[in-house]
Amino acid sequence: MSLDKGTKEEITKKFQLHEKDTGSADVQIAILTEHITELKEHLKRSPKDQNSRLALLKLVGQRRKLLEYLNSTDTERYKNLITRLNLRK
């Protein structure tokens, strides 16, 4: 279960900090969030898929680490991103 190229490009354009930004924490977190959302939907349809469940936990951990990094380096960007992605923090 991976995001197609068009979806990634759309997310990148929406969250990039400048024109050529493709790897900032903001973009990575947004892509991970979309991927997590898709995996959650998949797990609703296939609750016995343990490999996808483990992949979901791994992605959530990656996103959590990136969010912690962003919060420690630029709190204002962190708060803005949390609001834009409708995350619970």
Swiss-Prot record:
InterPro entries: Ribosomal_uS15 (IPR000589), Ribosomal_uS15_bac-type (IPR005290), uS15_NS1_RNA-bd_sf (IPR009068). GO terms for biological process: translation. GO terms for molecular function: rRNA binding; structural constituent of ribosome. It comes from the Bacteria. Part of the 30S ribosomal subunit. Forms a bridge to the 50S subunit in the 70S ribosome, contacting the 23S rRNA. Belongs to the universal ribosomal protein uS15 family. NCBIfam families: S15_bact. This is Small ribosomal subunit protein uS15. It comes from Chlamydia caviae (strain ATCC VR-813 / DSM 19441 / 03DC25 / GPIC). The gene is rpsO.
